[in-house]
Amino acid sequence: MTDYKATLNLPDTAFPMKAGLPQREPQILQRWDSIGLYGKLREIGKDRPKFVLHDGPPYANGKIHIGHALNKILKDMIVRSKTLSGFDAPYVPGWDCHGLPIEHKVEVTHGKHLTADRTRELCREYAAEQIEGQKTEFIRLGVLGDWDNPYKTMNFANEAGEIRALAEMVKQGFVFKGLKPVNWCFDCGSALAEAEVEYADKKSQTIDVAFPVADADKLAAAFGLSALAKPAAIVIWTTTPWTIPANQALNIHPDFKYALVDTGERLLVLAEELVESCLKRYNLEGSVIATAQGSALELINFRHPFYDRLSPIYLAEYVELGAGTGVVHSSPAYGEDDFVTCKRYGMVNEDILTPVQSNGVYVESLPFFGGQFIWKANPAIVDKLSEVGALMHTETISHSYMHCWRHKTPLIYRATAQWFVGMDKQPSTGEPLRERALKAIEETKFVPAWGQARLHSMIANRPDWCISRQRNWGVPIPFFLDKQTGELHPRTVELMEEVAKRVEQEGIEAWFKLDAQELLGDEAGQYDKITDTLDVWFDSGTTHWHVLRGSHDIGHATGPRADLYLEGSDQHRGWFHSSLLTGCAIDGHAPYRELLTHGFTVDENGRKMSKSLGNTIEPQKVNDTLGADILRLWVSATDYSGEMAVSEQILQRSADAYRRIRNTARFLLSNLSGFDPARDLLPAEDMLALDRWAVDRTLLLQRELEEHYSEYRFWNVYSKVHNFCVQELGGFYLDIIKDRQYTTGANSVARRSCQTALYHISEALVRWIAPILAFTADEIWQYLPGERNESVMLNTWYEGLSELPADAELDRAYWDRVMAVKAAVNKELENQRTAKVIGGNLQAEVTLFAEEGLTADLNKLGDELRFVLITSAASVVPFVQAPADAVTTEVEGLKLKVVKSGHAKCGRCWHFRADVGSHPEHPEICGRCVDNLNGSGEVRHYA
């Protein structure tokens, strides 16, 4: 018996079936490094249009988590897809290095006794060490970038650039010194940015406090009375008893109605709408004897409950009727609205009472409560109010309250002398900053679109930006202030440039060790050199200045504006926000053209990731068990516009999908064995109809994928590539071509046509997956036939695909109908296999009973219809001849019948044919196989 296996063109490739990604990926990384892949990309991109995705810097502290991995992979997929789209897309990774968390780490490790200089030195060392660890982890994810030369906000050039950015804003008149309430953390001993504030539930003691009237005659007149018959008081409600010692005014709404209520012993002023609820709370009975519009009570004085001073009525529209009494007590040092209202009524900074120190303790000189920590003083204040007869009611409530993101402790608003960027301050030229920023938001593209309204709302309502901090590890605010007037030195901008030059050489230490005389000469004695540092959001918020046109000048043809900023949705109040403000202040426009926001990771049940819940996914562990490409595939498959679910089970599903894509690639490569495109590639017009369709289908899909990539819709890319591999290729085309690929002559047109199609598909597919499966695509690239450069990334989307001619007889619609027929036949073949009627599809002979139009279509394939259906015989009969036992299908106008072939099985192609054994020299094989072995070979036209 002859062994015909050796006569077949069996698939062969060294491309491994088992990916072994955890072991293979580090080897691929080494190869990228050894060939200098990133440098080569910059070289080939010199004459291309530029696309700049500017990296929002992660904080240089700790190991990377799944959110970091998600963010960097998304960025890498964009950079890679833009590169393949013909752009020069540099990617410079960066790190945020200054700020309290690092300073806090150093204090915990080394103690709080350190000098400021030593603190900065240790902070710099710590940040550098953290960056190296994170860098290794980011590279392991397959992220292509300038890792040898990243930007760091602590690099001397960047620190100097930040000072220059501040100088620009000073020059344009945006920066001012002011006493304003800012978010203050006692543990940090510093002001906090809006982005450093989080909200959590807090138990607070609420109090209703009566302030006795001082201007009794005015109060009577306001209510239309000739005199007050009894003592009178106005009642406030607050959740912050500790602010009562700093009370300086009372706020009511000008448009609300206020009532004078007789409660027997005294008269109370309350909002008319709240009289009933207040009396019930105070366990009092009373009647309204008069009402007045809020505006009528303006500037009437009341007395502080336990200090000898007056509290006038100021009108304020922020007062609400949702809770309390309709009267708000005002401590301008400890509330934003309080401060604004008191300033509007002419209160000067020097008159604002600030009894709470930076550590949360009242100054010693404060009567009754000096030296007490404010939270602990609350009961004493309540007791004092009760003692003087001012306490109407007290209870404890739980409410959402602002906390420090780092220490998780409650914050307060605290008025301190700080440096601000004014939102509504008129600059030297152009519109105020708020106006510029709101206009810039309208000019920016947002993905998803809802981000625009969110950022607009934040900018429209935000206060002035407090940019100063009282910390050691930060870029200095290099100002000299006149000791007499407190004003900036008249040559401030010029002096800042001198400081920047020194910082460029020595880092921020240059400012802190600078002798003022060195810059000011004889004037030095007249000025104070300040020690405040900049908010870290100013560090990262000015990277468009000190990175994109500084340390890593991108040379963008349309200026230093980045094409894209991409971060998590929390950055609407963080990096997107601070960058927008500095960009609009310095340049008059946003530093980005487009903002892309991704959601946060949650587990499969939608719960937030947390170590206490045990539901965290560590990217390092995924790399070591499944491989980074699996993590990348998960990122691509998930719609990032909302929360992104990830778990071990979800990643396992990604691994299953990966195997299907890898197996498809392996099938393609193994069937290109012996194929040399320079020698064997057929022109489109010489290819078989099915092969031309496969290439055309690939071209159509490539057009869709290019559009999805350009819109950053990676989940669409993933689903369409996966479906293409599983359905159009695996479920249709690749199954059909096996017979032709294996059994026809090695150099026959039938086989070379098929290999030409497989080659085109492979060249396209390897590029499609390159932005997502970065490692696997480059691995496939090494196994593809023909001469090629060192990496798939050194190319653009494949241009060798051809379209079906417009007049093709077997057009796209034709093959869609054939696919539907094949699906119907497959369904019945499966039924027959399950019923044990046939052992395999090739043991079947199928008769198709078709309506006239479908009959004509199917007959176009002639005898090759059986190869498409992968049966040993296929015939088409008019629909009306269908017997009663013919199976009705989902295809309109089609019934079919499958029977087991009564013929012998060919020992070479495994088809069951009547002519098996008809050739005496080859008694075990069919006539077609004999012709393929010894004759001119079978001729195929279609499939």
UniProtKB/Swiss-Prot annotation:
GO terms for cellular component: cytosol. A motif ('HIGH' region) lies at residues 58-68. It comes from the Bacteria. L-isoleucyl-5'-AMP binds at residue 567. It is an enzyme of class 6 (ligase). It holds the Pfam family tRNA-synt_1. Its EC number is 6.1.1.5. Zn(2+) binds at residues 906, 909, 926, 929. GO terms for biological process: isoleucyl-tRNA aminoacylation. It is found in: Cytoplasm. ATP binds at residue 611. Binds 1 zinc ion per subunit. The keyword Cell inner membrane does not apply. Keywords: Aminoacyl-tRNA synthetase, ATP-binding, Cytoplasm, Ligase, Metal-binding, Nucleotide-binding, Protein biosynthesis, Zinc. One of its GO terms (molecular function) is tRNA binding. Its cofactor is Zn(2+). IleRS has two distinct active sites: one for aminoacylation and one for editing. The misactivated valine is translocated from the active site to the editing site, which sterically excludes the correctly activated isoleucine. The single editing site contains two valyl binding pockets, one specific for each substrate (Val-AMP or Val-tRNA(Ile)). NCBIfam families: ileS. Catalyzes the attachment of isoleucine to tRNA(Ile). As IleRS can inadvertently accommodate and process structurally similar amino acids such as valine, to avoid such errors it has two additional distinct tRNA(Ile)-dependent editing activities. One activity is designated as 'pretransfer' editing and involves the hydrolysis of activated Val-AMP. The other activity is designated 'posttransfer' editing and involves deacylation of mischarged Val-tRNA(Ile). HAMAP family: Ile_tRNA_synth_type1. Belongs to the class-I aminoacyl-tRNA synthetase family. IleS type 1 subfamily. PANTHER family: ISOLEUCINE--TRNA LIGASE, MITOCHONDRIAL (PTHR42765:SF1), SOLEUCYL-TRNA SYNTHETASE (PTHR42765). Monomer. This is Isoleucine--tRNA ligase. It comes from Pseudomonas entomophila (strain L48).
